[in-house]
Structures are given as structure tokens and as C-alpha cells.
Curated annotation (Swiss-Prot):
Protein name: Chaperone protein DnaK
Gene3D superfamilies: 1.20.1270.10, 3.30.420.40, Actin, Chain A, domain 4, Substrate Binding Domain Of DNAk, Chain A, domain 1
Skewed-composition ranges (Acidic residues): 629-647
Domain of life per record: Bacteria
PTM-bearing positions, type Phosphothreonine: T198
Gene: dnaK
Species this protein is from: Psychrobacter arcticus (strain DSM 17307 / VKM B-2377 / 273-4)
Family: Belongs to the heat shock protein 70 family.
């Protein structure tokens, strides 16, 4: 087995890590940063991921997808999805199966398909660092993700060309990273994870058992639609209201203005973690008949805190519930670990300290701990690390609908996984020939108030009075938290089983088609990269030859100059088209036309009359071209100019 990488697939940012010996390496991406924005943009025929996608978001808001994780595994009619529709500039559409998808240029895309683009970027980042192909990964999800969301995350990995060996919960992964430096002794930790789109809290017991570190999750709780994006939205709403009050113009309908506001709000929020006040200054945010309008608003830290205090307070309920479910008191917590970028906000740290009665630890990197923990689990699965045992739990109660529409639990929340549990049921009517098993996940007593994961039928039950047939329903949850469910008629031995896939979710055929599409895109991406490289080569060659012609003007005949200039013109024309081979041919033609000139230059310089390799003239230019390929900041200079314009 090769390296199993760890990926934190975040709402706002993603991160990839690998275990090297007894240390975790957080891998820098091509731009040189350790985290990558979880943003995917569709521009012409190109798919941009990460920083390059983020840079062009202002000029391409409708086709730039961010916070896609909040839609993964969700139904279009979910209240939280309907709320999101009014908050994002891109279009959220209803798929044929009722799922929440997105629509780009008239084409519907599933959230796992979009997330796969981010995972591909993480995969490529790891491959570039390791110098070998990577096919296996541990991917993290919010602890409070339900079965549909976990399955959708695995689908995203599959589309990206990854075998997801394990799905683990983000707080658990962070505890693994924290425990790496804690070599001995037992402790109970609370992991408070407030990320870009989700909130989780887990109570985890770390024990030293015969030289092996055992991480046992006692309880977990959270909110899968509460995170930094909501803090941004609160600030954006305030800025929109201030502008409306000042200029009598509503910016809500202007997607370009809203995208600029989003960037400015995120920046202001971050600045206010260290500064007492900051200014949001957006010139030319819009215009009307009276001329251009500018948005200039000064925001204090106290104002931001008043706008978001309710959001921070919402995290306290799950903390209290997690402690109750774990059966421990606040005083039993030895350490509090903060995970997720939003925990850098002073108000969040203050409220957490007040709740737990102790200052949270500052020695765990909130942006990288989750990926580090995933890499540790990857090393455990590959056999590279043998002194760690992870015991996780299922976050939500699992059960089936019984008479009266009641949810009858089969597996209670916070049950350790993997696990298998069974319960015997019977028929509700005389001579009932079949039973329908409807599976739900959640904490409500009324079945249909919970998340329906799926349904299946057990048929051909022999005629019998009600209550007589014995039907055993078994739930089997694997280490990823994904279920297989079976129902068996104990009288006949007839059984029916399924791996739960909700009425929503991607079919196997859809996943396979998306894999094929991704492979086709990979071929297109390579073609695009090769074309960009040969264009860079052409540009560098033209520049070098023109400089040489100018420097040696007195040594070159008119015919030679004309021949070279014709070759340059033909190469410039070819470089504007998309024919890689034609550009190569025109490059060779320029080299041949320039050869007599290079021979004269060398002969005159006393270097002999063999002529020089024209490539030498633009070696530096070629090297610069190669650097451009590895650096999105240079490739996408046009985006940087747009950014400068709006400052």
C-alpha cells in the first residue's frame, strides 16, 4: 500500500497532509500556501480551483462556486438550502431526484461533482510533493454529517480518482493531531470546531492503553449549517443596509457588487480579530443616473460582535448537550481545543472560555489540525503507524418508522462504531403480505420530522394474523458511519438488504459518468497546459530574437531581417490559435530563419561560425514560462489587475 494522504475538505478552505516517519507534513500547494480556498470557477472551457478561482470571483460571480459543502447530500426543499439561495450569487437548482444541485451556464452539476474538483487539486498537490501517484485518502467530514452527506463525500472522492479508505469526523481528526504530542497519561478533551460552514463539538477521551494511544469519542453534537459564512452574511447584510440608508440603493440584486461585498466583509472580519476597527472602502460599487456610488463604512470590533453574538451563542447549546450525552461535568474537561478559522474571533474564544471555565489551548493550528489528524489515520490504515486506536461514534439516532408514524430507534446517537444492532418487529394487519422499512436519522419522536435516508420492502410474507410474523431488522454501521440494513422474516428465512442510499444521492451510474467526465476534463486540462507552455515558449523566443535583431542590426542583411520578421509574424499568428502542433512548427521555422543571423553574431564575437542554438537566446524566458505554470499568481495576472482596480 502506498501513502494514504489526509484531506480536510473544508467549506471555506481545504488542506492536505501526509505522515512522514513520526511527523505530519502539511503540504503546500502550487501557490506556496498550506491551505487552498474551496472555490471552483467555470470560465469559458476552463475549470479554475483554489486561489485562481477566488481571484476572478468578482468578475465572474454567477459561475464561481463557494461553500458548496453546505449543499452536499441535501434536498433542494430543505429550509437551510432555501435560505442559502438568497445568500449566494450562483444558481442553486432542483435535480431530478430532488437534491440541491447548482447550475452553471445551463448545465446542472451535483455538489459531489464540484467537490471532486477540490479533491483533485488536493490529490495533485500531494502527488507533486511525493513524486508519485496517490490513489488513497482519508477524508474528513463534520461530526454531525448524516449518512447522505457522508455518502456524497465518498462519491466526491471516487469522482476525483481517490479510494476514500475512511471518512472520519473533523473534531476527532483534530484530537488525533493534538494527541500526537501528548505521549503519556490520560485526558478528556473538548474539541470546539467552528469552520466556514459547519459547527461541531466532540468530547474525546485520550487514554494510554499498553503503550497504545486510544482515542474514544464519548459524545458529539453540532449544527451543519452554522459557520464563518454566516458571520460573513451578517456583516454583508449590515453593509447593504448602511448603503441603502446612505444612498437609497439596494445592492442585493447586483451580483457583482455582492461579490465585492463578500470579499470585503471576509477581509474586515479577519482584520477585526486583531484590530479594534477597520474601514470597508469600495469605490464605484454601483451607479445610478446621478453617477457612481462609493461604499465607505467604518466597522468596530464591538459592532461585529453585536451582529454575530447570536451566532456564537447558538454554539453553546450543542456544547451543553455533548457534555450531558458524555455523562461528564465541565470540571472533567482537561483541555479545550479550538478548530476552524472562525475560532480566531476574540468573541468566540471568550464565550468558549466562559462556558468551559478554562482558556482554550493555542498550540493547535485551527486551519491544519484536521488534515494532520486525517494523515495520522491514513498512516494507521496503511500500517505505517500502529500505536493509535480510534473509537468514533455515530452522531445521530438511527431507526425505522413504526405504527402511528413514530420513530423507533435501532441505534442510539453516540453509539460507538462500527456496530451492528437488531430488533424484531411484526405486521400491523392480518395476512399482511409485505412490510415497508422506512429508515430515518435524527432525534425527533415523529419519524417524518427526521432525515429520511431510504426505504425498502420485504415481500412474500406468508398469510398470518397480525403480530405473529417475526421480522428482524438489523442495522450495520461501518467505520465511515455508512449503513447497511437488512430485514429477515424469521419464519421463512427470506431476507432483503440494502446499503442505505436515500431517495436523493447519486446513483452508481451517475457517479461513473462523472468519473468519465472528470477523466475527460483531465485530458483537456493537460492539453490546455501543453498549449500554455508552447505559447510561453513562443513568446519567449520572439522576445529573444527581436532583441538579438535589434542589437545586431548593423550585421544583418535586409533579406535575413525580412525572413526572420516573417517567421515572427507567422509564429505570433499561430500562438493566437489553439493548434499546439502548428505553434511548434512555426517555432521551428523561426529557429531556421534565425540560424544565419545567429551564425553571424557568434562569428563576429569570435565564437566560431558553427552558429548558436536559438534556444539560448530565450533560456531565461523559457524558465520564466515554467515558473508561470507553477504559479497561479503569474498565470492569472489579468485577475490581479481586476483586484487592483477595485481596491
Amino acid at each position: 500500500m502506498g501513502k494514504v494522504i489526509g484531506i480536510d475538505l473544508g467549506t471555506t478552505n481545504s488542506c492536505v497532509a501526509v505522515m512522514e516517519g513520526d511527523k505530519v507534513k502539511i503540504i503546500e500547494n502550487a501557490e506556496g500556501t498550506r491551505t487552498t480556498p474551496s472555490i471552483v470557477a467555470y470560465k469559458d472551457d476552463e475549470i479554475l480551483v483554489g486561489q485562481s478561482a477566488k481571484r476572478q470571483a468578482v468578475t465572474n460571480p454567477n459561475n464561481t462556486l463557494f461553500a458548496i459543502k453546505r449543499l452536499i447530500g441535501r434536498r433542494f426543499d430543505d429550509k437551510v438550502v432555501q435560505k442559502d439561495i438568497g445568500m449566494v450569487p450562483y444558481k442553486i437548482a432542483k435535480a431530478d431526484n430532488g437534491d440541491a444541485w447548482v447550475e452553471i451556464n445551463g448545465k446542472k452539476l451535483a455538489p459531489p461533482q464540484v467537490s471532486a474538483e477540490i479533491l483533485k487539486k488536493m490529490k495533485k498537490t500531494a502527488e507533486d510533493y511525493l513524486g508519485e501517484a496517490v490513489t488513497e485518502a482519508v477524508v474528513t467530514v463534520p461530526a454531525y454529517f448524516n449518512d447522505s452527506q457522508r455518502q456524497a463525500t465518498k462519491d466526491a472522492g471516487k469522482i476525483a480518482g481517490l479510494d476514500v479508505k475512511r471518512i472520519i469526523n473533523e473534531p476527532t481528526a483534530a484530537a488525533l493531531a493534538y494527541g500526537m504530542d501528548k505521549k503519556q497519561g490520560d485526558s478528556t478533551v473538548a474539541v470546539y470546531d467552528l469552520g466556514g460552514g459547519t459547527f461541531d463539538v466532540s468530547i474525546i477521551e485520550i487514554a494510554d492503553v499498553d503503550g497504545e494511544q486510544q482515542f474514544e469519542v464519548l459524545a458529539t453534537n453540532g449544527d451543519t449549517f452554522l459557520g464563518g459564512e454566516d458571520f460573513d452574511s451578517a456583516l454583508i447584510d449590515f453593509l447593504v443596509a448602511e448603503f441603502k440608508k446612505d444612498q437609497d440603493v439596494n445592492l442585493k440584486g447586483d451580483s457583482l457588487a455582492m461579490q465585492r461585498l463578500k470579499e470585503a466583509a471576509e477581509k474586515a472580519k479577519i482584520e477585526l480579530s486583531s484590530a479594534q476597527s477597520t474601514e470597508v472602502n469600495l469605490p464605484y460599487i454601483t451607479a445610478d443616473s446621478s453617477g457612481p456610488k462609493h461604499l465607505v463604512v467604518t466597522i468596530s470590533r464591538s459592532k461585529l460582535e453585536s451582529l454575530t453574538e447570536e451566532l456564537v451563542q447558538r454554539t453553546m447549546g450543542p456544547c451543553k448537550m455533548a457534555l450531558e450525552d458524555a455523562g461528564i461535568k465541565i470540571g472533567d474537561i482537561d483541555d479545550v481545543i479550538l478548530v476552524g478559522g472562525q475560532t480566531r474571533m476574540p468573541l468566540v474564544q471568550q464565550k468558549v472560555q466562559e462556558f468551559f471555565g478554562q482558556e482554550p489551548r493555542k498550540d493547535v493550528n485551527p486551519d491544519e489540525a484536521v488534515a494532520a489528524g486525517a494523515a495520522i489515520q491514513g498512516a494507521v490504515l496503511s500500517g505505517e503507524k500502529t500505536d493509535v486506536l480510534l473509537l468514533d461514534v455515530t452522531p445521530l439516532t438511527l431507526g425505522i418508522e413504526t405504527m402511528g408514524g413514530i420513530l423507533t430507534p435501532i441505534i442510539e446517537k453516540n453509539t460507538m462504531i462500527p456496530t451492528k444492532k437488531s430488533q424484531v418487529f411484526s405486521t400491523a394487519e392480518d395476512n399482511q403480505p409485505a412490510v415497508s422499512i422506512q429508515v430515518y436519522q435524527g432525534e425527533r419522536k415523529i419519524a417524518n420530522q427526521n432525515k429520511q435516508l431510504g426505504r425498502f420492502d420485504l415481500t412474500d410474507i406468508p398469510p398470518a394474523p397480525r403480530g405473529l410474523p417475526q421480522i428482524e431488522v438489523s442495522f450495520d454501521i461501518n467505520a465511515d458511519g455508512i449503513m447497511n440494513i437488512s430485514a429477515t422474516d424469521k419464519g421463512t428465512g427470506k431476507a432483503q438488504s440494502i446499503q442505505i442510499k436515500a431517495d436523493s444521492g447519486l446513483s452508481d451510474e451517475e457517479v461513473e459518468q462523472m468519473i468519465r467526465d472528470a477523466e475527460a476534463n483531465a485530458a483537456e486540462d493537460e492539453k490546455f497546459a501543453n498549449l500554455a507552455q508552447v505559447r510561453n515558449e513562443a513568446d519567449g523566443r520572439i522576445h529573444a530574437v527581436q532583441k538579438a535583431l535589434k542589437d545586431a542590426a548593423d550585421k544583418v542583411s535586409d533579406d535575413e531581417k525580412s525572413s526572420v520578421e516573417t517567421a515572427i509574424s507567422e509564429l505570433e499568428a499561430a500562438a493566437k490559435e489553439d493548434d499546439h502542433d502548428d505553434i511548434k512548427a512555426k517555432l521551428e521555422a523561426l529557429d531556421n530563419a534565425f540560424l544565419p543571423v545567429s551564425q553571424k553574431i557568434y562569428a563576429d564575437a569570435g565564437a566560431g561560425s558553427e552558429g548558436m542554438d536559438p534556444n539560448q537566446f530565450q533560456q531565461g524566458a523559457d524558465n520564466a514560462g515554467e515558473n508561470n505554470q507553477a504559479d497561479d499568481d503569474v498565470v492569472d495576472a489579468e485577475f490581479t489587475e481586476v483586484e487592483d482596480d477595485k481596491k
